[in-house]
UniProtKB/Swiss-Prot annotation:
PANTHER family reported in the protein's UniProt record: SULFATE TRANSPORTER
Localization per record: Membrane
Summary of the function given for this chain in its UniProt record: H(+)/sulfate cotransporter that may play a role in the regulation of sulfate assimilation.
Protein name per Swiss-Prot or TrEMBL: Probable sulfate transporter 3.3
Primary location: membrane
Record topology, Extracellular segments: 91-92, 139-144, 193-223, 278-309, 369-384, 432-441
Entry GO MF terms: secondary active sulfate transmembrane transporter activity; symporter activity
Matching SUPFAM superfamilies: SpoIIaa-like (SSF52091)
Keyword Transport: yes
Length: 631
């Protein structure tokens, strides 16, 4: 068999290596490549298009695209208006703030966002988290002005955090919210949100401030004397209507407009019923009078000092992470369906600046919602102009239609919220996770039950902590396997995976399947020593020749640090004492370079013990074995 040499990598300066490492870490998409070799005018145009994606598609915009965007924009507006009012109440904010948040942020996103399908506005989970975290220290009833100030300040910090992640290209931080974590978190939050609506659906006036399931259910059954049969009847009727339209649209996607228009129709019909029958005099709670006009400025309400600074910063951080994760996940989902690319870092900047601007214009945390984006996509949206159309529709509502909402019953808003969040409970995905990875399923359950029985933020923290623990376990306890030869071939595979694979007498072939660093070097030392001892005992029992070669297959070792180098040096000393030669197979360039630097005495990086494949190593060493052992 021909033996190929392992060559040292081309020399690179430290600066060049650092530059390459930083580029691959923070700029894997190489955004500057489009500027190379271009005249200055072209560079300026492309820079403007990169910062403002609207400039990319705006010159080619046509009337046919406008027709599609107008239809989709009006469709999502019919959903955004009742949802905006409902989600604001979920966040313990005045209902009008929900409409403000459906006006300004979509305009900002239309200019800065890169997704064609993302429909921007308030979302249930971020609303729940914002309201619950702020209410722990400030009552929205006793001090509504301060509560509103803290909500806007939290929105500013959320936007600042989101935009900073995009500018610094640190989006990988949100990847710690794994799919299992999100499914459990969203499912638990959906149940908590639904339970919170029991206050409105039953007509209860005195309700607990806690969010977990036990206090909520206790409060519901402790105040049965406050239950209003009129409210219950209206709530059940509209809830059944909304759930029926949702089920119909799921069964027949072409009828998406049925579920999209159902919330607005429910608001209109219920408002007419309350107005005609004066139901507010018979126990039906209504929104009340809402102010007319566009968003008033709120930058003077932002708080950057005082005793509540830590609260708003923490609330902004949590809501920022959750809303950013949801927005990017939704954007990427629909981009994949339509075969176009969404730049994650651009999205972070767009969503972040959208919230920063929103905090100064009486808006609270917004992002791209899955329900509205799905409707936007089904309605035929072609560009972000659909967000502009939705925003203009909300503007008209704010200017001229606000008196119509005075008699809108709160119970219908609760029914709208329950219908919207029930889709967040994804049982098929949970079953899929159970089949694939039991630990991920455990993480999902911890997130789910943590949200339900503790709090939204604690449930999220537990799930993220378990995800980090899983990553640490994978880093500190890397996979390492014994390899054997598949008879009749030159292929070497895991002995425990391929039962036909056979270990070669006199050789111990180990495959390390991770970088070797300070976190796992001690574990690898103990694991390797144990296998050497077991192999020697096995050789003695079967009366084979003694173990002569320890072969390390290193194709998956992408890097080593100082501790990793020490691991190999100590391993060489250990094997030398046992008259065993240490052999390296296919070490990568970074590993070769560092080991050669550390091997000043040329003790273990000798060419005769470096091979490209395990088969070449075994074939070559089998011929030279006895002589090489004494070199």
């Amino acid at each position: 068999m021909e033996v190929h040499k392992v060559v040292a990598p081309p020399h690179k300066s430290t600066v060049a290596k650092l530059k390459t490492k930083l580029k691959e870490t923070f700029f894997p998409d190489d955004p500057l490549r489009q500027f190379r070799g271009q005249p200055n005018r072209t560079k300026l145009i492309r820079a403007a298009q990169y910062i403002f994606p609207i400039l990319q598609w705006c010159p080619e915009y046509s009337f046919s695209l406008l027709k599609s965007d107008v239809v989709s924009g009006l469709t999502i507006a019919s959903l955004a208006i009742p949802q905006g009012i409902s989600y604001a109440k979920l966040a313990n904010l005045p209902p009008i703030v929900g409409l403000y948040s459906s006006f300004v942020p979509p305009l900002v996103y239309a200019v800065l966002g890169s997704s064609r399908d993302l429909a921007v506005g308030p979302v249930s989970i971020a609303s729940l988290i914002l309201g619950s975290m702020l209410r722990q220290q400030v009552s929205p009833v006793d001090d509504p002005v301060l509560f509103l100030q803290l909500a806007f300040s939290s929105t500013f910090f959320a936007g600042l955090f989101q935009a900073s992640l995009g500018i610094l290209r640190l989006g990988f931080i949100i990847d710690f919210l794994s799919k299992a974590t999100l499914i459990g978190f969203m499912g638990g939050a959906a149940i908590i949100v639904s339970l919170q609506q029991l206050k409105g659906l039953l007509g209860i006036t005195h309700f607990t401030k806690h969010m977990s399931v036990v206090p909520v259910l206790s409060s519901v059954f402790q105040h049965t004397n406050e239950w209003s049969w009129q409210t219950i009847v209206m709530g059940v009727c509209f809830l059944l209507f909304l759930l029926s339209t949702r089920h119909l649209s799921m069964k027949k996607p072409k009828l998406f407009w049925v579920s999209a228009g159902a919330p607005l129709l429910s608001v209109i019909v219920s408002t007419l019923l309350v107005f005609v029958f004066r139901a507010e005099r018979h126990g039906i709670s209504v929104i009340g009078k809402l102010p007319e006009g566009l968003n008033p400025p709120s930058w003077n309400m932002l708080q950057f000092h005082g005793s509540h600074l830590a609260l708003v910063a923490k609330t902004g951080l949590v809501t920022g992470i959750v809303s950013l994760t949801e927005g990017i996940a939704v954007g990427r989902t629909f981009a994949a369906l339509k075969n176009y690319h969404v730049d994650g870092n651009k999205e972070m900047i767009a969503i972040g600046l959208m919230n920063v601007v929103g905090s100064a214009t009486s808006c609270y945390v917004t992002t791209g919602a899955f329900s509205r984006s799905a409707v936007n996509n089904n309605a035929g949206a072609k560009t972000a102009v659909s967000n502009i159309v939705m925003s203009v529709t909300v503007m008209v509502t704010l200017l001229f239609l606000m008196p119509l909402f005075e008699y809108t019953p709160n119970v219908v808003l609760g029914a709208i919220i329950v219908t919207a969040v029930i889709g967040l409970i994804d049982l098929p995905a949970a079953c899929h996770i159970w089949k694939i990875d039991k630990f991920d399923f455990l993480v999902m359950l911890c997130a789910f039950f943590g949200v339900i029985f503790l709090s939204v933020q604690n449930g999220l923290a537990i799930a993220v902590g378990l995800s980090l623990f899983k990553i640490l376990m994978q880093v500190t306890r890397p996979k390492m396997v014994i390899m054997g030869n598949i008879p009749g071939t030159d292929i070497y595979r895991d002995l425990h995976h391929y039962k036909e694979a056979q270990r070669i007498p006199g050789f111990l072939v180990l495959s390390i399947e991770s970088p070797v660093n300070f976190a796992n070097s001690n574990y690898l030392t103990e694991r390797t020593s144990r296998w050497i001892e077991e192999c020697e005992e096995e050789e003695a029992q079967e009366k084979h020749s003694s173990l002569q070669f320890l072969i390390l297959e290193m194709s998956a070792v992408s890097g080593v640090d100082t501790n990793g180098v020490s691991f190999f040096k100590e391993l060489k000393k250990t094997t030398a004492k046992k008259d065993i030669e240490l052999v390296f197979v296919n070490p990568l360039s970074e590993v070769v370079e560092k080991l050669q630097r550390a091997d000043e005495q040329k003790e273990f990086m000798r060419p005769e013990f470096l091979f490209l494949t395990v088969a070449e190593a075994v074939a070559s060493l089998s011929l030279k074995g006895p002589s090489l052992s004494n070199v």
